[in-house]
């Protein structure tokens, strides 16, 4: 996939644990999605096991939104698709809760 075809994240993403290293000695590919100062999702690369090389995504972390949208998590083939899943899940949560969409919150990496 070319860079211009990859999903363009709309929200702030940060490493879950800055400086933490994985089994291979490289920085962990583990990130949280932050919207309006709140962690709303997480993605992490699967280093071992049958899903090795994929990214696990989890949504539904908002403490302010009290509705559930399923599925709340799953696996994606790459980091861009996993980020898309988390951001779209958060959009659905806001919609189900009757809240307006979040726009214009993307900040530089």
What are the residue ranges of the model-derived segments?
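Intrinsically disordered, low-complexity charged/polar segments
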Residues: 95-109
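Negatively charged, low-complexity tracts enriched in Asp/Glu with abundant Ser/Thr
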Residues: 1-38, 66, 104-106
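A short, exposed loop/beta-hairpin motif centered on an aromatic-Gly-Thr core
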Residues: 60-81
